[in-house]
Amino acid sequence: MTQEILGEVQTGKIPLKGRTLKELSEIMVSLGEKSFRAKQIYHGLYVNRYESWEQFTTFSKTLKEKLEGLCSLTQLTVVKHLKSVDGTQKFTFASEQGKEFEAVWIPSGDGGRKTICISSQVGCTLNCKFCATAKLEFQGNLKAHEIVDQVLQVEKIVGDNATNVVFMGMGEPFHNYFNVIRAASILHDPDALNLGAKRITISTSGVVNGIRRFIENKEPYNFAISLNHPDPNGRLQIMDIEEKFALSELLQAAKDFTRELKRRITFEYVMIPGVSMGPENANKLVKIARSLDCKINVIPLNTEFFGWRRPTKQEVAEFITLLEPAGVPILNRRSPGKDIFGACGMLASKS
């Protein structure tokens, strides 16, 4: 049994959500049970969506009582549920320790695409000037079961299954790499939630050592970089991560990703008038886009309460026109859920 699991045995019940099948097998054997019980539990949690031991009807009463005493099927508590006029729904969850974080259900206009935006941390270690989460006190990383359970609880409440999951909620995913990748593997596993790897997107603000690890491990998931400015000095003014990981280093890692994994990367770009827009910034962004296989998602600023304003539709259209010489796909990403503080950059447990 791993040191992590041993520690949990000593401090209380072992949470079984967020475990790989191999880890569940180790736990069952350590408890004196046959390893095949692990697959039954795994299937029960993620396919049947069981939430209590009583639902495991193939288990004997003795086994259920034993597991009830030693293992936990803990689930997140929903402390707030808000619905937008556009169909977006925001969920504020509380962990067992009472720490709050958020996830968002985002259906497309035609209902064909249903995305859950999930959090990886409570608050964030970074200070992106346009992001409401950055203003919160950082309270720690989420464990894998707390990440996976966001998807399970949202799907249960809305009564529908997501077509896509994006790690773009609270926190920097690559500052919680192990738990994020473990959660993604459960979301992807055909014996669990069975989401295709291309339907799972992990985003980073530019943690280069995390990108290197992602490449080395040949992770199959979609990958996005929150770029937001094409110039190192300009980027430093709005993203403090530039102090640790320079833009040049980040772009080299992005090029290595596309070359070694032969997959396209997505650049997320928040449009802030007078800060990240205009012909000069557009030309620099075009140069970056031409240097590797990428697409660009442009996002009009949502957090106007930080002293900047949201670009007009005309300004957005003009900026996109300036980017067209890059010859890459450009998406003007809609940001639903503004009325419930559920849009991109707005997650901060506000209502």
UniProtKB/Swiss-Prot annotation:
Note: Reaction proceeds by a ping-pong mechanism involving intermediate methylation of a conserved cysteine residue.
One Gene Ontology molecular-function label: tRNA binding
The family this protein is said to belong to: Belongs to the radical SAM superfamily. RlmN family.
The name this protein goes by in its record: Probable dual-specificity RNA methyltransferase RlmN
Gene name linked to the record: rlmN
Functional summary from the UniProt entry: Specifically methylates position 2 of adenine 2503 in 23S rRNA and position 2 of adenine 37 in tRNAs.
High-level lineage: Bacteria, Pseudomonadati, Spirochaetota, Spirochaetia, Leptospirales
GO cellular component term of the entry, any: cytoplasm
HAMAP family for the chain: RNA_methyltr_RlmN
Cofactor (UniProt): [4Fe-4S] cluster
Subcellular localization, as worded in the UniProt entry: Cytoplasm
Residues that, per the record, bind [4Fe-4S] cluster: 124, 128, 131
